[in-house]
């Protein structure tokens, strides 16, 4: 729909409910980025204890004992840092994926990464596998890297010209 202008400016499109819903849905996915940067820190001791239990379970009753401190530190550092590696890796593929699938389908594909990552991280303790947690962190990092580029592109494409700048900044605010 167009709104006429009496002062000679070009007509502007109205903000519709569909536009608000589409922008809100797209930008809501960006919350995963900030959440997953910080969420790993609070349960550090619980995760380290789980790593130790997994280590002991794999060693058997005659194993050397609990996980060496250096190995635990390395596993913990990898668990935290792999998020950024996943984001960096996927950001290199952003252009290829967005051109291949289009913005909307690429965001839908990206959501499968988030679901898979959540499943891996959620089941890691039950499966006694710190590798699942690390892989899940890599995949959620890949999700975040793709979302950081796909969401602003998508919002910029669907937003009316006069609102493009304002709506484009919502990704950073989420």
Swiss-Prot record:
Record note on modification:
Sumoylated. Palmitoylated. Palmitoylation by ZDHHC7 controls the insulin-dependent translocation of GLUT4 to the plasma membrane.
Claim: Signal is one of the keywords in the record: no
One GO term in the molecular function aspect is: D-glucose transmembrane transporter activity
Catalytically driven reaction(s)? D-glucose(out) = D-glucose(in)
User: Where is the region Interaction with SRFBP1?
Assistant: 2-8
Which intervals lie on the Cytoplasmic side per UniProt?
A: 1-19, 98-114, 159-166
Q: Which UniProt keywords apply?
A: Cell membrane, Cytoplasm, Glycoprotein, Lipoprotein, Membrane, Palmitate, Phosphoprotein, Sugar transport, Transmembrane, Transmembrane helix, Transport, Ubl conjugation
How does this protein sit in the membrane?
Multi-pass membrane protein
Give the protein's function.
Answer: Insulin-regulated facilitative glucose transporter, which plays a key role in removal of glucose from circulation. Response to insulin is regulated by its intracellular localization: in the absence of insulin, it is efficiently retained intracellularly within storage compartments in muscle and fat cells. Upon insulin stimulation, translocates from these compartments to the cell surface where it transports glucose from the extracellular milieu into the cell.
- Domain note: The dileucine internalization motif is critical for intracellular sequestration.
Give the protein name, as stated in the record: Solute carrier family 2, facilitated glucose transporter member 4
From what organism does this protein derive? Sus scrofa (Pig)
